[in-house]
Amino acid sequence: MPRRRRRRGSSGAGGRGRTCSRTVRAELSFSVSQVERSLREGHYAQRLSRTAPVYLAAVIEYLTAKVPELAGNEAQNSGERNITPLLLDMVVHNDRLLSTLFNTTTISQVAPGED
């Protein structure tokens, strides 16, 4: 009785499986490869783990979704139609976690720099 070989990584009828990017695997919108390239080019550390760019891409994606969402809610509550830099600044400073994260950040056209 002949033995059948089992193929690894094949999908379907003898076809090759498609490679899946780290961005797709992590179900993110921000490119994990771009984040990794930025981390490597920035020379922030001698070594970089495989999961650090994935984690950072997820954090960036979360922040870019959360801050405009909070600003939109604040704009609706105050009867405004547009999200302005002032609203963004107000949202960041009113949220405890965002306030500590952006403690030393100055948003342009909102708070003038110190002379």
Swiss-Prot record:
MF annotations from Gene Ontology: DNA binding; protein heterodimerization activity; structural constituent of chromatin
Main subcellular localisation: nucleus
Stored SUPFAM superfamilies: Histone-fold (SSF47113)
Region called Docking domain, residue ranges: 87-115
Miscellaneous comment text of the record: In contrast to other H2A histones, it does not contain the conserved residues that are the target of post-translational modifications.
Family, per entry: Belongs to the histone H2A family.
Protein name: Histone H2A-Bbd type 1
Record organism: Homo sapiens
